Amino acid sequence: MSEKETNTTSTENKEKEKQEQTNTNSTTESTNNQVDEEYERPGRSEGLDEFGIQLDIQQSDPNSPLYSVKTFEELGLKPELLKGVYAMGYNKPSKIQEAALPIIIQSPNNLIAQSQSGTGKTAAFTLGMLNCVDPSINAPQAICISPTKELALQTFEVISKIGQFSNIKPLLYISEIEVPKNVTNQVIIGTPGKILENVIKKQLSVKFLKMVVLDEADFIVKMKNVPNQIAMINRLLPSNVKVCLFSATFSMGVEELIKKIVQDPYTSIRLKRQELSVEKIHQYFIDCGSEDNKALILSDIYGFISVGQSIVFVHTIATAKSVHQKMVDEGHSVSLLYGKDLTTEERFKQIKDFKDGKSKVLITTNVLARGIDIPQVSLVINYDVPLDEMGKPDPVHYLHRIGRVGRFGRSGVALSFVYDQQSTNKLMNISTHLGVPLKELKSSEIESLDGILKGIRNQLTPLNN
């Protein structure tokens, strides 16, 4: 598939899209019968696809130069970081890294960056954070805010690996993990509540801060109280702090919130709408006949599948627990992960067991829909059609869910369950919205999934992005 990049500059972003503001402050009822509150909040999608190639780059300052790089050496990275990059197996910058890294490292501009899932966004901003740090100053100099503990942990691990040859000390800053009162670590990675609360209380110093990153920014800015907290923090930050927002999608209703966070001058890197493509992911749906039959169909699927690992996404914690128990009773090796009620230690153990291959199936809510990179996952099952908090079809979460396969250009399979006309209509609404046709898989054809997955696994080769 061909790639090309279009650079344009303008004095202001003239594209004004219709926005539909959603209610992010709705209350959560009982734990089991509701969606996983920690992660089911954003509104409906703009329809921006994670898997397009072409980027649209715009700047608020037309006099600021635009350029990209083709090698990591061109960036003037510190030698110890360049060594860390190559130790990670990166030979050359990916598309988003080519465009974003010069802005992060060499430009004074703030950054809003959108690119498809699995293209190296994390490596882009972690390199930028590490490169701005002065190791001789024992104080926070770069902060990354992630929406979930699992994503924060993954980012912490990437930073630790890329920075392994430096004297930079990263710190995982989340609840239930003890942190020092006087933080001397230069790079902080954590969740919104923990970081924002302690910055406001001045328990986390921002005196030497140079860079703030919001990962999965479209979700974070719509979390309860976060925009107000960020506005308060902006008044505490040094004037020269660079703010970088990254996401694979941008939901409707976030533009005004983003403008409160990212000040001029800024550069915006977005997917071109006409470049929508999800051809690397084979997408199917199966009519289970009734809601009760969904568990039986799932059992049949895992009776045939013998290759790789998979993630099963459900809508509520109660469903997650029920599906998990049924699969355990049938003798499957299964992990269970959701946001509420599980301790941080339990959550990290579940994701580690799955990443280490101790379990082959992970049952989860949308808490794991964004950002998590598990290369051996070749199948995603939407046990429940993804819905927003209003019960409407949610293309954004659909994209993020199926984005757990097809990482870094690999192939994968996404299978969605429907069981009546209403669930079918909701899934078809997502399909139409994204312009992506879904093939029907008959229950009599379930056995063919194993052959499809084996073919995909045989195609996998190590990728250097």
Curated annotation (Swiss-Prot):
Residues 1-20 have a biased composition (Basic and acidic residues). Residues 297-449 form the Helicase C-terminal domain. One of its GO terms (cellular component) is nucleus. A motif (DEAD box) lies at residues 215-218. Transmembrane segments: none annotated. GO terms for molecular function: ATP binding; ATP hydrolysis activity; mRNA binding; RNA helicase activity. Signal peptide: none annotated. SUPFAM superfamilies: P-loop containing nucleoside triphosphate hydrolases. ATP binds at residues 115-122. Its EC number is 3.6.4.13. The Q motif is unique to and characteristic of the DEAD box family of RNA helicases and controls ATP binding and hydrolysis. Belongs to the DEAD box helicase family. DDX19/DBP5 subfamily. ATP-binding RNA helicase required for normal differentiation and development. This is ATP-dependent RNA helicase ddx19. It comes from Dictyostelium discoideum (Social amoeba). The lineage of its organism: Eukaryota, Amoebozoa, Evosea, Eumycetozoa, Dictyostelia. The gene is helC.
